[in-house]
């Protein structure tokens, strides 16, 4: 979802499925799928082995993780691995900021109406370069919008970042969660080995 120039991932914990949430999920998924359609169309003039019409009917083994666009580029020899395809979206001007994903406030409110807790996923991915005061300022703004928790423990989070975020959550009474972001087999190769369920280092006593 979109928030002040950032593209955030917000999780819903303990919610009751509702038509509103289903509609938001469907809308977001359609935009994600369209990103790959647009990428193949943009790359096709440079790579004759790519066929936009063929791609629209393309199917892949979901057990391998990733998504159709990554698999198609890999099978066609454009990339050497599934993860090699990920930077291409931004390179061709087709990253998340180019699409009208829902606003963070809209997602947070919908999760709350579904009696769930909105949790910010992997904050270091967006805010890792900020000074502590600026980071806590953003956390406070999101809390004012209704955020109820933060994914504190994550593969890219340093011990310092995780401890700082956990401290903020404890002071605010927010959920403290942990996640590996395991997306299947494609994330278990190259430099992605740490993205495995159960491999994450954390402080269990702080989870809440």
Locate each region found by the language model.
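A metal-dependent hydrolase metal-coordination microenvironment
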Residues: 1-65, 145, 150-199
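Surface-exposed amphipathic alpha-helices with a cationic face
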Residues: 44, 105-115, 119, 166-170
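Hydrophobic, aromatic-enriched interface-forming segments
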Residues: 45-108
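Non-catalytic positions within long, well-ordered alpha-helices that form the structural scaffold/packing
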Residues: 112, 140-143
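Conserved beta-strand positions in the central sheet of alpha/beta enzyme cores
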Residues: 119-120, 151
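Short, small-residue-enriched loops and turns at beta-alpha junctions
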Residues: 125-130, 156-158
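Charged helix-capping and loop-helix junction motifs
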Residues: 131-140, 167
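Extended, intrinsically disordered, low-complexity segments
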Residues: 197-208
